[in-house]
Amino acid sequence: MNENNDITLTLRELWGKANPLWERRYEDFITTHTDYSVGTSKYLDSRGKVFGAGYEIYIVAFFLGLYANRRKPMTKDTSKKRKFGQPVGYWGQIEARGLRQPYPRIQDYIFAALFAKTNVDLIALDKGEIPAAQVISQMKQTMEEYANFGFSYMTEKLEENPDYFFKEGAFLKLFLPFLETAEECVEGPESLD
């Protein structure tokens, strides 16, 4: 394994220990659609929720921001921020229940997207001029800002229509406007004629 792979592996492992923040103003939205803050003894009370753990809706919020290519800075007030109980390295590693299967590869997809979208000076990192912890902090900030846009976008939809998320496929339909934009961008090269 060459030195660059060692750096990437180390970054991946360090990033797995990160626990991204989210703004408290989205807590009602998160608890409405997830089992977040619901103990296992209350599992039956949480029927009808689309997502299990709170981080699952965070993943959706992150990908909304990523697909829209929009970031929204977090509030600087730390009292208005929260984090989920599990670091990213545990996301998607739930046990299989019924039709539900673990999905740990999501971590790899998120990491790859963050690595591509975060302005990291790999040469400075390789030379030891910047610590890996600084790179992880930058990647975590990128993730938080994409997710913050995603949460903002979802709550806007909720304000427009309070029943929006109680319709089949509502969370998937959130991505459609951004997918159409992406398809327009890859139509092909401009003619040189």
Regions found by a protein language model. Give the residues of each.
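Charged, low-complexity intrinsically disordered terminal regions and linker tails
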Residues: 1-45, 71-193
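Short, basic amphipathic alpha-helical segments that act as recognition/interaction helices
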Residues: 41-75
